């Protein structure tokens, strides 16, 4: 038996690939959801099937708070479906947060084509029985194919080991080991069997830009979007509420508890004839806290979301102001060279506002972080959907401006003129001179300048040149990098 198990593990290693082609127009890709109580290994199974660490896996209940999805595709095995990891459905005394999570997960089950019900070999609880009863009785779920998997079966199980599962009324169970990758190939074969000739369902929705915001089918796997937009900010700044306000429906779990969204969620949106991929990231916490196991992977994915994005909305809390940690986020965005804009959320909660309130807020903001003076800023209320459409208009505008290319001759002419205007006012030495410059990238707006002496170009002169570039080429919100090189022939 040991050899057979070893062979099965080897087989499972080559079953899964997530490199999928674009979905054919009109073709629907089915959805498979992993369900179970907390801490039975759902996220570990999700990651093992994907062969990458996408969901958070940690031996602590309640880690996956939102529905994660990824496409599994392998042409030679005729495998093509969306795999979804749902939160644990066993919260006995649901508070406002867990109730919202439960509703999100139950909604996901109703949209699934096949359900993988995961159980723990070592422990059957009342939560398992309760979830099983729900799957059997819920009208929109009861007729769906369900694969019952017994996880943590690292050794072969005999009939005695499975007796308790049979007493639950499960006529067929599949022993697996998510960590050891045992029998994952068989699991995929069962999924393939149930999905054969099924029309499938669409996992993501197309969001109309109209006020009605009616949902229509749209494939998640298509990547013909204009740009990738990430929403970042400290915990409880309203990121998920903003995502829901933009989408017009509750795609992410929303709660007033900081850190509710621990997993990045991608949503493909269409506004008129323009598309974008919207990412709601986990709240960035201070480095000392993200070192903890529970938040580590979420923090890393947030950084990756910023790195992989084309444009970023940095969300601020109007009542909390611009704190030291917001400065760290802004510095990170500057460091990564990402175009971004500031959205001051919860503006409706500010009392006794006047015509000068916003101006005073900006002045205070710029005094704490002068670089923000050239960044677009807008006040919004995600919960009230105040100026959310204007925020999206600004995002599309910023995306368009982030590809600004300037001819080398024009750059050289303007920069030399500006430096002539500056004269010696920015240097105690002889006037700094630029011999030649060229643009090497658009986002960030990166210039290489060959100069007489690099040390002559002090920070005040560099700031002056960046300001002139911003004003001349409409680069508000787009980081500018000036790289100076000495040219001493």
UniProtKB/Swiss-Prot annotation:
Keyword Repeat tagged: yes
Family annotation (PROSITE patterns): G_ENGA
Family matches, as Gene3D superfamilies: 3.30.300.20, P-loop containing nucleotide triphosphate hydrolases
Classification via CDD domains: EngA1, EngA2
Example GO biological process: ribosome biogenesis
Annotated positions binding GTP 2: 233-240, 280-284, 345-348
MF term (GO), any: GTP binding
Pfam families: KH_dom-like, MMR_HSR1
UniProt keyword annotations, A-Z: GTP-binding, Nucleotide-binding, Repeat, Ribosome biogenesis
Binding-site list for GTP 1: 36-43, 85-89, 151-154
Occurrences of domain KH-like (ranges): 404-488
Record carries keyword Nucleotide-binding: yes
UniProt cross-references to InterPro entries, sorted A to Z: G_ENGA, GTP-bd, GTPase_Der, KH_dom-like, KH_dom-like_a/b, P-loop_NTPase, Small_GTP-bd
EngA-type G domain boundaries: 30-199, 227-403
SUPFAM superfamilies (alphabetical): P-loop containing nucleoside triphosphate hydrolases
Chain's role: GTPase that plays an essential role in the late steps of ribosome biogenesis.
Membership in a protein family: Belongs to the TRAFAC class TrmE-Era-EngA-EngB-Septin-like GTPase superfamily. EngA (Der) GTPase family.
Quaternary organization: Associates with the 50S ribosomal subunit.
Name of protein: GTPase Der
Naturally occurring in which organism (per UniProt): Leptospira interrogans serogroup Icterohaemorrhagiae serovar copenhageni (strain Fiocruz L1-130)
Origin organism lineage: Bacteria, Pseudomonadati, Spirochaetota, Spirochaetia, Leptospirales
């Amino acid at each position: 038996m040991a050899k057979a198990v070893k062979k099965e593990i080897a087989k499972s290693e080559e079953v899964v690939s997530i490199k999928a082609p674009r979905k054919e127009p009109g073709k629907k890709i089915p959805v498979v959801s992993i369900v179970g109580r907390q801490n039975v290994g759902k996220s570990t199974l999700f990651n093992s099937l994907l062969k990458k660490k996408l969901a958070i896996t940690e031996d602590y209940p309640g880690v996956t708070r939102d529905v994660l999805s990824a496409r599994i595709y392998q042409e030679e095995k005729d495998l093509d479906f969306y795999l979804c990891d749902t939160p644990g459905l066993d919260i006995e005394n649901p508070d406002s947060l867990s109730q919202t999570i439960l509703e999100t997960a139950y909604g996901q089950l109703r949209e699934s084509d096949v359900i993988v019900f995961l159980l723990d070999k070592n422990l059957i609880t009342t939560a398992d029985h309760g979830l099983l009863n729900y799957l059997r009785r819920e009208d929109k779920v009861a007729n769906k194919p369900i694969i019952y998997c017994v996880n943590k079966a690292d050794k072969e199980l005999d009939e005695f080991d499975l007796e308790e599962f049979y007493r639950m009324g499960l006529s067929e169970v599949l022993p697996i080991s998510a960590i050891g990758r045992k029998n994952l190939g068989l699991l995929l074969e069962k999924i393939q069997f149930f999905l054969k000739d099924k029309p499938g369902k669409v996992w993501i929705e197309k969001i109309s830009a109209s006020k009605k915001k009616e949902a229509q089918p749209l494939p998640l796997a298509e990547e013909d979007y204009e740009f990738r937009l990430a929403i970042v900010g400290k915990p409880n700044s309203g990121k998920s509420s903003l995502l829901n306000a933009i989408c017009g429906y509750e795609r992410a779990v929303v709660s007033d508890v900081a850190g509710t969204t621990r997993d990045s969620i991608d949503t493909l949106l269409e506004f008129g004839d323009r598309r974008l991929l919207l990412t709601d990231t986990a709240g960035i916490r201070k480095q000392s806290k993200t070192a903890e196991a529970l938040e580590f992977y979420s923090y890393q994915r947030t950084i990756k979301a910023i790195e992989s994005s084309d444009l970023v909305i940095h969300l601020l809390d109007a009542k909390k102001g611009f704190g030291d940690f917001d400065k760290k986020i802004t510095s990170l965005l500057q460091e990564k060279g990402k175009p971004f804009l500031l959205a001051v959320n919860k503006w409706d909660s500010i009392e006794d506002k006047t015509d000068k309130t916003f101006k005073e807020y900006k002045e205070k903001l710029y005094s704490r972080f002068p670089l923000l003076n050239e960044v677009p800023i807008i006040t919004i209320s995600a919960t009230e959907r105040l100026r959310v459409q204007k925020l999206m208009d600004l995002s599309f505008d910023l995306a368009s401006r982030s590809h600004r290319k300037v001819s080398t001759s024009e750059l050289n002419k303007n920069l030399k003129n500006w430096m002539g205007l500056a004269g010696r006012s920015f240097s105690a030495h002889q006037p700094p001179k630029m011999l030649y410059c060229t643009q090497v990238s658009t986002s960030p707006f990166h210039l290489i300048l060959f100069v007489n002496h690099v040390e002559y170009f002090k920070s005040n002169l560099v700031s002056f040149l960046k300001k002139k570039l911003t004003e001349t080429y409409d680069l508000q919100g787009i980081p500018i990098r000036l790289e100076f090189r000495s040219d001493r022939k």
